[in-house]
Design a protein with these regions (language model features):
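Cytosolic-side transmembrane-helix boundaries in multi-pass membrane proteins
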Residues: 295, 301, 305, 325-327, ...
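Helix-loop-helix "hairpin" substructures at the membrane interface of multi-pass membrane proteins
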Residues: 345-422
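Membrane-embedded helix boundary and interhelical linker motif in transport proteins
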Residues: 239-286, 466
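Single transmembrane alpha-helix segments in multi-pass membrane proteins
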Residues: 208-252, 286, 290-300, 378, ...
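Extended repeat-based scaffolds of very large eukaryotic assembly and lipid-transport proteins
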Residues: 22-164, 168, 172-204
Length: 500
């Protein structure tokens, strides 16, 4: 008998949530849009874990009417209320990340009816980040409280956040005729100034970080150019196309993974790195052997020849892949970012690119300073004739150095494919900036290239919002011209006796 009773109670316990789900669903389907909105507001103010499946079905548009094949039709207002109700229910989740996301959603959409529930959740919340997010959501609602002391506390809390939404709320509170209490208005003005100051700091840091990521691409492009230009004195106008070929090599590797190893698609950028390096290095060495070697000492002919080669490479890519941009997707481990400030997110792909660029710089320095090839390159750079007299195969060194520079540019193309569009004209956007980096940093100087690349990248990103991209580039170019007139050797000059 006890066993039978236990089974009966267990069956009732299992059926109760299903009955509640069915009852809420029937009430919602039977109601008109106005009544449905009231139901959603009630559910948001009084969350019930048994109702989350119903709200999830509504959110995904999977709730159908009995006897009909079509799904329930919802207007935009109802969809917004469904999102708010879902956020309220997700505050009951055990996962702190889910609660944090829900609290951030409620900062934008919470209704006054949810005030009591949010207050209860805030009192029992142990996670610091979720607690802070809930405090902000609660403060947004308390701005319309009848008690001036509550409004004053809410205004002061908003001033500590530095959130863009807080600025909007405070600006609304300071509209004529909105807030009658003088103390609250004064506190709102102070808090608004604090929020604007914090937002400005976040914007400046964001621009600096974007500049560093742009500088990383310029560094990878200019690093190879510094080697070839510093060693051979060749103005290679096709160097930007090595970036483009590296990006298209990444695209081809992605296609191969999609077709033959879709289960390992997340790792395609790691395979694309050596592929892009060897493809562009081989093309660079072939270019040096067939064209540039016969034009040494004739800079104008070299410039025109490499410019023509760049046009040929662009047209070849258009014939093979089409004139439109191709899609290179970020793997999951390069998607998303780190939330540093309310208005500052550092994307993972840009963080990885900056670290990768610095890693390539270290490898290049080791190659040039700790290997026999590097010794030969530095010898030929300082005095080609004397190096040849000492037995250094200058022709072979020229070819390998040109291939190394082109390969590094190919690595830059892999990095660029993760943050920008990949198209036939990709390299044209970076060739001028790459030459500016080389000239500003000092021909053949790695340290100068690093400083110049990051400096130009950050300056570009800071000036763009202020005076526009075109005027920003003009101003930077003018400043570089003035600098070169005063210091023609750039930031760092080559040490030793260099023969021009």
């Amino acid at each position: 008998m006890p066993t039978t009773l236990y089974r009966f109670i267990l069956a009732i316990a299992l059926l109760l949530p299903m009955a509640a789900f069915a009852g809420d669903a029937e009430d919602f389907v039977a109601a008109n849009p106005v009544q449905q909105a009231k139901l959603l507001e009630t559910w948001a103010a009084q969350p019930d874990p048994t109702r989350i499946e119903l709200i999830n079905a509504l959110q995904k548009g999977e709730l159908t009417i009995d006897g009909q094949a079509k799904t329930l039709r919802l207007n935009n207002r109802l969809r917004g209320l469904i999102d708010t109700a879902m956020a309220s229910h997700q505050l009951l989740a055990a996962d702190a990340k889910i609660r944090l996301s829900a609290a951030q959603q409620l900062q934008k959409s919470a209704k006054p009816a949810q005030l009591k529930f949010l207050d209860q959740q805030l009192a029992g919340e142990n996670d610091e980040s979720v607690h802070a997010a809930l405090s902000l959501a609660l403060a947004n609602l308390q701005l319309v409280d009848t008690d001036p002391a509550v409004r004053l506390a809410a205004v002061r809390l908003l001033g500590e956040t530095g959130d863009p939404l807080a600025r909007t709320r405070l600006e609304g509170l300071l509209e004529p005729g909105v807030e009658a209490d003088a103390n609250v208005r004064t506190a709102a003005e102070t808090s608004l100034a604090q929020v604007k100051r914090k937002l400005l700091i976040g914007e400046m840091l964001g621009q600096a970080f974007s500049g560093m990521s742009l500088g990383s691409i310029l560094l990878l492009a200019a690093l190879g150019l510094a080697i070839t230009f510093g060693l051979l004195g060749v103005i290679n106008m096709a160097h930007g196309e090595m970036l483009m070929l590296g990006a298209y090599s990444t695209y081809v590797v992605q296609l191969m993974f999609q077709r033959y190893a879709p289960q390992a698609i997340e790792f395609y950028p790691l395979i694309a790195l050596p592929v892009a390096f060897f493809v562009t290095a081989a093309i660079g060495m072939a270019l040096e052997r067939t064209v540039i070697r016969h034009l040494y000492g004739r800079p104008l002919e070299t410039l025109l020849a490499t410019w023509g080669i760049s046009l040929m490479l662009i047209q070849l890519v258009r014939l093979l892949f089409g004139a439109q941009n191709v899609e290179v997707a970020n793997p999951a481990w390069l998607s998303g970012g780190i939330q540093v400030l309310p208005n500052l997110v550092l994307p993972y792909n840009r963080i990885v690119i900056i670290a990768f660029a610095l890693f390539v710089v270290v490898l290049t320095w080791l190659l040039l300073n700790k290997t026999r090839l590097g010794l030969n390159v530095r010898a030929v750079t300082q005095n080609r004739n004397m190096a040849a007299c000492c037995g250094v195969p200058t022709g072979r060194v020229d070819m390998l150095a040109f291939g190394l520079g082109s390969g590094i540019a190919g690595l830059g193309g892999v990095a660029l494919s993760q943050i920008g569009n990949v198209g036939p004209d990709l390299g044209q956007s970076y060739i001028i900036d790459s030459f500016l980096v080389v000239v500003l940093g000092g021909v053949g100087q790695l340290a100068g290239s690093v400083l110049a690349a990051f400096g130009l990248g950050i300056a570009n990103k800071i000036l763009e919002p202020q005076i526009g991209a075109v005027l920003g580039k003009i101003l930077i170019l003018a400043l570089i011209i003035l600098f070169i007139q005063k210091r023609p050797q750039g930031l760092f000059a080559l040490k030793g006796r260099v023969i021009d």
